[in-house]
């Protein structure tokens, strides 16, 4: 039965692919740029390359997507600006926090401890988040969402400090990105939050400017933070996601057939990040241990008990109704 099912699935995919290929002559020659800030070894770059390959394959090579990883074309605010204004970036991968500067209600997604598992997060993204944000992203950002990439659950790393409960972070100088939710989270814990550009984070850790940072394990490993941090606390305080976005004018200029190609490639790229980020998390933690990091489980309830002020701040930014509706959708 399993072999029959797999064979049928393969046949359906092949038929769909042939359908695209058969119409390859209908696609115009076109070059698109896709830029992001993740390391070349990161799952997001693998997904970006899959997107480029599928677009090329499904258009018979007529449409080529050039991928620019690791901030080659600028940091995320710069990439968003270029894409928003129809500059050199046609497609980009953007964080929720950077998108929230255009669409304030997206701040709701920055609330701490919203999700307990990858499965819960994925179901909420598919059934609520995508339709919830699509219209506003198109109207206020002038971009079309093509998918939501997993970035992973964020955890805390430290140098010379063991974190097992919330109070262990009190007074600790920690780098936090400019996300309203993450800043509110660590402020509520009594940490000494510092907003440092990601491009400067490694050197800041190495030089002791900050003693701690927080990121998904895939990022911690890909960017070699284990070289200047010796402890990993599995706080899982925030499920991070980033959107694959395309300039709306560019998308609208395409034929319906090419739009279908772009959207299919976007969802396939999204699903690859889900497979890689969640599927490799345990393996990456073992790799971090092998690099010398000590890994600790934490008392998550001690963290959750302190999140009241963080939720109040976030509700003011996104609107209490938006935050309440998101929480209801998750439950």
Q: Where on the chain are the PLM-derived regions?
A:
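N-terminal secretory/targeting leader peptides
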Residues: 10, 25-123, 129, 135-331
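Short, low-complexity disordered leader/linker segments with a strong preference
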Residues: 1-31
